[in-house]
Amino acid sequence: MTFEIPEEMEWATYDASRVWQISKGGGHNFTAEVTAVGDNGSYDYDSMIFYVSEKVDKNEFHNASNYIKGTAEIYQDHLRENIKLDKKAISTLQKNKSEEKSIERIKKGIAEMEAKIPLAKIYEHDLGIPDSHILGSKNIPFHVLLWRNQRVYYFTFSKPTENSAQRIKDLIARFRTRELYEVPNEPGICFPYGFIADDGKTAYELKNSLRFTRTPNVIFSLLTASANDPWQTRPTSGLYDSDFRPGYDRQKWKKSALLDSLHIGKRLVAFEGWRLDPRPDSGERERAWFGLAHTGGTLDPLVAIQVQTFQKGTDDLTDYTPPPEEVLPRLKALSQSIEQRLAR
């Protein structure tokens, strides 16, 4: 999917303060509190999920690798401690002959934990890929960290195969970094500052948030998914009930429906949500609004646009939230330019 940008914008990425824990998951953000939920990418290639960081020092790249290794060591220590506790429990139960069934159950659990300890160890694999940390079990790598253009790119595979090393090399050969406004010529999937070339047959689900730099209180989450994607992605992915029904002080704000329409590419769709406007004489200057529009889904490629606002004072926001009338025309220009080059 491609689209035109009417003005300067920025993508949400994995922020610098969390990059060392990028394997922990979560999602991309602008700041800790200015964020959507579930910003990342899924790619049906050994069940891959991926993230990209903002620009950071290279030490964060190495720290991210050490975190994966350290987490595995902590888990191994946790298993060893549980084994010690269970062995003490057996010693206590052996004084009572009627507890033989319980003892056998605990012994079985100990055997299972002992088997897990060597499997939990993380090994580093040398696949000949520059500036990379390839991590996994003794024979099967399933974590990939790349250092490219001062960013950390993280790929993790939840269903690696016996030939995962070769599959990782094949994937990285198709991956490349991408500048902010760069549009690749060949087919594939784009994500913030990255691109994976493919033949258009691999299922995907991507949620990436952007915002215009002159109105940072308003973020647009673009959710795209291939037809019949295995994750059964819905337009409301990452949204909560409170996003649709917000709590507010009725003396300060008036709530009303936000009903409009916009084009997603050539398709005219409804844009529905709500708005909270300050009441006259309330002394309040802040406002909030929310909207959702989508096309496709299930049998057709999905494209959804989720719009959320964040009030002045949230992290580094210094201005009040602009009204929909100020922002929606610019969003409409963007959404109308959307083009799905290869609808898989």
Regions found by a protein language model. Name each.
Residues 25-27, 157-160, 275:
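Secondary-structure transition/turn motif
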Residues 4-26:
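N-terminal ordered "arm"
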Residues 47-146, 211-299:
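Signature of long, low-cysteine stretches enriched in small and polar/charged residues
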Residues 21-48, 52, 59:
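Long, solvent-exposed N-terminal ectodomains/accessory regions
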Residues 165-219, 224-227:
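Surface-exposed beta-loop interaction hotspot
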Residues 2-4, 10, 31, 35, ...:
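Ser/Thr- (and often Asn-) enriched beta-sheet segments in non-cytosolic proteins
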Residues 133-160, 175, 289-316:
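A short, solvent-exposed beta-edge/loop patch
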Residues 1, 9-10, 153-192, 305-344:
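Surface-exposed amphipathic alpha-helical segments
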